[in-house]
Amino acid sequence: MSRYTGSIFRKSRRLGFSILETGKEFAKGKQRRYAPGLHGLRRSKPSDYGVHLREKQKVRFMYGLSEKQFRNTYRKATKKTGIAGTLFLQALESRLDNSVYRAGFAETRRQARQLVNHGHFLVNNKKVDIPSFQLKQGDIFELTTRKDGKIRKNQQILTSLETRTPAAWLEVDKDNFKVVFNRMPERSELNQEIKESLIVEFYSK
């Protein structure tokens, strides 16, 4: 299954979950927390499989991954010792594109992924254009200075850095467009609407 590139607002409505994590999709006068269409309010009780599938889809769409990417990330993460669900969420959070988003360089994960794809970031002084690149404790990523640092003057990036609050596990130097990945996030610091145990059960069947 390919990565979803359609309307985030519509998908959030269908899932009853804010993919943007801001609730913006359900702001007054915009969208409602039920599926789009004439019969959006009529929801039959989902099966046990349906409940697990919906939870997986919520998180997959939130991070913007294809099914293959999502499943592979889960399998790699859960080979480590620890709580499977937490390890999985930490693996998703430590992706370079997600960290670019969490640091405040972009308003959405889609925008962050595009910045990485276009080669605008260095990790430990080396160009990395792979969104799925896994950051480790102590890694440093920053906006490139190539082409006379043109990307550092991008107004959209500057506005995002100014208005968004970076994640607690990232040390952001806004003046130098540089970020230190200090540590893995604690589960309590991540989205509390996610029931990762259902995803673990889904992939364990």
Swiss-Prot record:
An annotated Gene Ontology molecular function: rRNA binding
InterPro entries: Ribosomal_uS4, Ribosomal_uS4_bac-type, Ribosomal_uS4_CS, Ribosomal_uS4_N, S4_RNA-bd, S4_RNA-bd_sf
GO biological process: ribosomal small subunit biogenesis; translation
Alphabetical list of CDD domains matching this protein: S4
Keyword tags: Ribonucleoprotein, Ribosomal protein, RNA-binding, rRNA-binding
One GO cellular component term noted in the UniProt record for this chain: small ribosomal subunit
Domain of life: Bacteria
Entries under Pfam families matching the protein: Ribosomal_S4, S4
Location of the S4 RNA-binding domain: 94-154
Family: Belongs to the universal ribosomal protein uS4 family.
Biological function: One of the primary rRNA binding proteins, it binds directly to 16S rRNA where it nucleates assembly of the body of the 30S subunit. With S5 and S12 plays an important role in translational accuracy.
Annotated NCBIfam families: PRK05327.1, rpsD_bact
Subunit structure, as described in the record: Part of the 30S ribosomal subunit. Contacts protein S5. The interaction surface between S4 and S5 is involved in control of translational fidelity.
HAMAP family: Ribosomal_uS4_B
Name listed for the protein in its UniProt record: Small ribosomal subunit protein uS4
Organism listed in the record: Mesomycoplasma hyopneumoniae (strain 7448) (Mycoplasma hyopneumoniae)
